[in-house]
């Protein structure tokens, strides 16, 4: 499935972020 890289605009589709979650409309990496 197609997904967005961290830092990419995700709108209201958090499930499309690759190994990241949608925060403030952008994919944020879960790694710290």
Swiss-Prot record:
<keyword id="KW-0528">Neurotoxin</keyword>
<keyword id="KW-0964">Secreted</keyword>
<keyword id="KW-1015">Disulfide bond</keyword>
<keyword id="KW-0872">Ion channel impairing toxin</keyword>
<dbReference type="GO" id="GO:0017080">
    <property type="term" value="F:sodium channel regulator activity"/>
</dbReference>
<keyword id="KW-0800">Toxin</keyword>
<dbReference type="GO" id="GO:0005576">
    <property type="term" value="C:extracellular region"/>
</dbReference>
<dbReference type="GO" id="GO:0044231">
    <property type="term" value="C:host cell presynaptic membrane"/>
</dbReference>
<keyword id="KW-0638">Presynaptic neurotoxin</keyword>
<comment type="function">
    <text>Delta-conotoxins bind to site 6 of voltage-gated sodium channels (Nav) and inhibit the inactivation process. This toxin acts on Nav1.2/SCN2A, Nav1.3/SCN3A and Nav1.6/SCN8A (EC(50)=1.7 uM).</text>
</comment>
<feature type="modified residue" description="4-hydroxyproline">
    <location>
        <position position="6"/>
    </location>
</feature>
<comment type="similarity">
    <text>Belongs to the conotoxin O1 superfamily.</text>
</comment>
<keyword id="KW-0379">Hydroxylation</keyword>
<feature type="modified residue" description="4-hydroxyproline">
    <location>
        <position position="14"/>
    </location>
</feature>
<protein>
    <recommendedName>
        <fullName>Delta-conotoxin-like CnVID</fullName>
    </recommendedName>
</protein>
<keyword id="KW-0738">Voltage-gated sodium channel impairing toxin</keyword>
<feature type="disulfide bond">
    <location>
        <begin position="3"/>
        <end position="18"/>
    </location>
</feature>
<feature type="disulfide bond">
    <location>
        <begin position="10"/>
        <end position="22"/>
    </location>
</feature>
<feature type="disulfide bond">
    <location>
        <begin position="17"/>
        <end position="27"/>
    </location>
</feature>
<keyword id="KW-0960">Knottin</keyword>
<dbReference type="GO" id="GO:0090729">
    <property type="term" value="F:toxin activity"/>
</dbReference>
């Amino acid at each position: 499935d197609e997904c967005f890289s961290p830092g990419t605009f995700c709108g209201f589709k958090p499930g499309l972020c690759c190994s990241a979650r949608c925060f403030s409309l952008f994919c944020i990496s879960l790694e710290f």
